[in-house]
Amino acid sequence: MAIEKELLDQLLAGRDPSEVFGKDGLLDDLKKALSERILNAELDDHLDVERLEGGPANRRNGSSKKTVLTGTSKMTLTIPRDRAGTFDPKLIARYQRRFPDFDDKIISMYARGMTVREIQGHLEELYGIDVSPDLISAVTDTVLEAVGEWQNRPLELCYPLVFFDAIRVKIRDEGFVRNKAVYVALAVLADGSKEILGLWIEQTEGAKFWLRVMNELKNRGCQDILIAVVDGLKGFPEAITAVFPQTIVQTCIVHLIRHSLEFVSYKDRRTVVPALRAIYRARDAEAGLKALEAFEEGYWGQKYPAIAQSWRRNWEHVVPFFAFPEGVRRIIYTTNAIEALNSKLRRAVRSRGHFPGDEAAMKLLYLVLNNAAEQWKRAPREWVEAKTQFAVIFGERFFN
């Protein structure tokens, strides 16, 4: 409902912007007046309901003062009371000291990568609110329950494509700051939309860790993954085939190219990349192997022998790529979504230095993912062609 212009003119008459929007200005006065009006209306309604229900006689019994935090200020409210003590306001509950928008503001700032100290300074500078670091941590800790629910939510029966990738995060563990891997699984559904299946902080290395992750996915309802795209994760192929025996494990071509370029001087990179293209764009596995051999024996292969060695080590999981038609290859090769996702996660953790523990890291990374969730839902342009080819290649498995 729009506020009448004449009423606004009366409220703003003779006031400059600082008197309206500043601390203890008109906006704060209005918020206080409206809140107290709502509280009194709530008590009237409460007393009317008790009378209609034939309860014991009850009536107003004065008021009490209560200081609460809102999203923009600290405010002292006059809270009406009833004689029987049965009134518990909905606007601001009896033992509540913060309006919900205050918590939402803190969580929003935290999700944007701001540290506890930065949030504290921001609230003090903009709103004149002095909030302790413990309170900010307590507010953000309320997210942990949502993290648990999200990490254990039911999954789809089948995912045509799942990218498994990792970022490195510094986390304090047993008195030492360790550089831990945080793994993320980004799935493409049958309609081309995307879903983040979960986040896992590395506790053990290799197949044992990945077996636990795969069993977790299965216990949450996932019965099949058609193609899993990974970046040389130790123990991953053995673990996924133990739980999802029909899954094709495919090395991420983009990561393999990047790894190859780590051996190459900067001035040579623009020439080496086209030379590698002949390998992964070959028509089939046999032609791809011949292209690899030609590269290995050629000028760049002789100058940078570690490149061909890297491709040969991963060749078993490069080969599946050649069996797919162009539409499916393009989807596997196009890693824009996972790259954008990792970029957001890295940007959020960059200013942190290190996290005090695994829970603190999970809390922030979950909030970053949750804020970006809408972006992952859109199907990529390439999916229209790829979907038809997935259906032909995988048949009934694709439609589960």
Curated annotation (Swiss-Prot):
Protein's organism: Rhizobium meliloti (strain 1021)
Pfam families listed in its UniProt record: Transposase_mut
Name of the protein in its database record: Transposase for insertion sequence element ISRM3
Classification via InterPro entries: Transposase_mutator
Gene Ontology biological process: DNA transposition
Annotated keywords: DNA recombination, DNA-binding, Plasmid, Transposable element, Transposition
PANTHER family: MUTATOR FAMILY TRANSPOSASE, TRANSPOSASE FOR INSERTION SEQUENCE ELEMENT IS1081
GO molecular function, a single term: transposase activity
Family (UniProt): Belongs to the transposase mutator family.
PROSITE patterns: TRANSPOSASE_MUTATOR
Protein function: Required for the transposition of the insertion element.
